[in-house]
Amino acid sequence: METGGGGDGTGDICCLSYNQDCTSVAIGMRSGYKLYSLSNVERLDLVHESCEAKDVYIVERLFSSSLVVVVSHAKPRQMNVLHFKKGTEICNYNYSDNILSIRLNRQRLIVCLEESIYIHNIKDMKLLKTLLDTPRNPHGLCTLSINHSNSYLAYPGSSSTGEVSLYDANCLKCECTIPAHDSPLAAIAFNSTGTKLASASEKGTVIRVFSIPDGQKLYEFRRGMKRYVNISSLVFSMDSQFLCASSNTETVHVFKLEQLPERSEENASWTGYMGKMFMAASNYLPTQVSDMMNQDRAFATVRLNFSGQKNACTLVTIQKLPRLLVTSSSGHLYVYNLDPQDGGECVLIKKHSLLGSAKSETDGDSDAESPVPVSYAATVARPSSAPALSTITGYSEDGGTLRGEVIPEHELAVGPVCLDDEKEFPPVSIKNP
């Protein structure tokens, strides 16, 4: 999920993004890009670093595989699909306008331009569908469910209101339109199963959650009332119990998605009677007042020591404990503990630097180096003899990659793979149709 793209980063950082299951973080820089593993609180493992492309403003990794998609300011209309372990380019593709965002899961790769969206089959990069004349979308706002069994795509259905268009990228058909907000959309996100969609408008005061694919409103949360903010990051926890939102302010909000009570036909208790009276009375109030009475507040918060910087947040489980991570455009990763029972103020337990050496800080103190067992990330990060990128020229919209490689099936699998086994990388050539 890319949350800091668009090329308007601060200093050396051009973009920030987590992979689909938030097990790694990617940063695009003036000098190239880096991938870090998020498997340990105490230290960051550098999975890969590349200086081949400069001014990288989009970098997306496919889960924990070796596949990464990169777009640079030098060629903003060209998408490059790379296999960083082998040091090769699988394919590249050029579009009619600048690429604003890219989303991918194990079935589909989505390329979003300002007024069109391209849907590719990720296994062979064949272009399956082009959504033309979509509402003007200057920030490339869109999201793709990571559950490949449904592959729902959501994008703005209007440039003037907060309408969400829901598209089935597997069956290549429109599902529904959700009137989510009165103001234009600022952020949208699916949960891990693709059964819920969260949205926020440019005002940034109210966050709503809808059921998918029917588009029924399930929850409504109020981030604040005093001021409008620019929400830059919106993400569910993997178990869909929490929803996290960060903005250009110093506060990150975590909302708890309480299990919705089943509506019984009859409830003769005093509380049930009062509840019915309350709901009946709210129907006579102005709509804005009635909505506010039914909105929930944040379950937990984080007070950042900065504001005004672009940042990306996520909720993960690291070393069996729930954590809230915030990556800032200044090049730092902040790790907080989240109390899943009581919520409240989250506690900062670690601060990592994403630029230069992978030093970590806790309350201003640097950690001493300690031996670390060899992991997948450490293995991938080992330097190799300067691999030259193989340039693959040409691409057919009907036939996919030309003289390139089909993306290996195991890169799309759920389980672990043997990345060093050459038998798992049979060179498959695709001929012209």
Swiss-Prot record:
An example Pfam family from this entry, by short name, is PROPPIN
Fetch the InterPro entries from UniProt. PROPPIN, WD40/YVTN_repeat-like_dom_sf, WD40_repeat_dom_sf, WD40_rpt
Identification of the protein by name = WD repeat domain phosphoinositide-interacting protein 1
Q: Name one GO molecular function term.
A: phosphatidylinositol-3-phosphate binding
Q: Which gene encodes it?
A: wipi1
Motif (Nuclear receptor interaction) on chain: 127-132
Q: How does it sit in the membrane?
A: Peripheral membrane protein
What is the taxonomic lineage of the source species?
A: Eukaryota, Metazoa, Chordata, Craniata, Vertebrata
Task: Please give a single GO biological process term from the UniProt record.
Answer: autophagosome assembly
Query: Which protein family is it in?
Result: Belongs to the WD repeat PROPPIN family.
Q: Where is this motif: L/FRRG motif?
A: 221-224
